[in-house]
């Protein structure tokens, strides 16, 4: 969903528009995620954002909850720079950390979110990452995860969902050949898990009260408690 570290994402407005074209209801996803975090994060709470490059969720969360402090983690210096450009002067309550979950502060955090990121990780690394997030959260703290998650069996259903995703992109104005090429790239590069597998990983990592709150073609989103 996000550009690779070697790719210049462009100016903040065009980057935001490009991501929104690929993720159905992106703005509403950010709003819903903020609402779910706010059910348990206090007014002056500390929130961990994993995969914070680009800054879109940081912008949405910090505007809605100016009292929160955010630690944003991302491996790409290019995408962290993009987040800084997007946020402008609104970074007083945001600390960036270049790296992965092991480079994040130990916490404890009052909440955490990882949007459009976990689908890049294979099963074992995804589980390890989720456990590391869980370890950094206060007991009962909310965690939001949203990413590509759809049936991955051999009965043709994965291709059906990918075709539906491509059809949505074409309906939004993307060239059909480009949309279909994107599907092939996803099939080759993304170690996508099924929703049931994603939920099992959250539970295995120590989370409880796992609830689906967002479903948009190939994308799913959950809220869980540490």
Segment roles from a protein language model:
Residues 148-204:
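C-terminal alpha-helical "lid/dimerization" subdomain adjacent to the S-adenosyl-L-methionine
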Residues 208-226:
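Core SAM-dependent methyltransferase catalytic element
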Residues 4, 9-27:
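Class I SAM-dependent methyltransferase Rossmann-like catalytic core
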Residues 104-112:
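A short acidic, Gly/Pro-enriched loop at the edge of an enzyme's catalytic core
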Residues 25-43:
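Conserved alpha-helix/loop element of class I SAM-dependent methyltransferases that forms part
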Residues 140-148:
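Conserved beta-strand signature within the Rossmann-like core of class I S-adenosyl-L-methionine
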Residues 127-139:
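A short glycine-rich, Lys/Arg-flanked "PGG" loop and its adjoining helix->strand segment in the class I
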Residues 48-49, 54-103:
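Class I SAM-dependent methyltransferase SAM/SAH-binding core
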């Amino acid at each position: 969903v996000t550009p690779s570290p070697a790719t210049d994402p462009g100016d903040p407005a065009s980057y935001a528009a490009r991501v929104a074209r690929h993720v159905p209801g992106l703005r509403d996803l950010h709003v819903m995620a903020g609402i779910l975090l706010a059910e348990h994060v206090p007014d002056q709470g500390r929130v961990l954002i994993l995969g914070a490059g680009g800054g879109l969720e940081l912008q949405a969360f910090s505007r809605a909850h100016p009292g929160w402090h955010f630690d944003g983690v991302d491996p790409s210096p290019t995408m962290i720079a993009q987040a800084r450009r997007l946020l402008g002067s609104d970074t007083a309550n945001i600390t960036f950390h270049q790296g992965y979950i092991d480079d994040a502060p130990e916490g404890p955090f009052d909440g955490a979110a990882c949007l459009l990121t976990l689908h890049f990780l294979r099963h074992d690394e995804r589980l390890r990452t989720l456990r590391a997030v869980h370890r950094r959260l206060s007991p009962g703290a909310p965690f939001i995860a949203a990413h590509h998650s759809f049936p991955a069996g051999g009965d043709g259903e994965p291709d059906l969902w990918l075709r539906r995703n491509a059809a949505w992109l074409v309906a939004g104005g993307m060239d059909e050949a480009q949309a279909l090429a994107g599907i092939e790239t996803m099939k080759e590069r993304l170690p996508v898990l099924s929703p049931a597998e994603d939920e099992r990983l959250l539970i295995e990592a120590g989370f409880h009260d796992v609830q689906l709150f967002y479903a948009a073609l190939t994308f799913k989103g959950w809220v869980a408690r540490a």
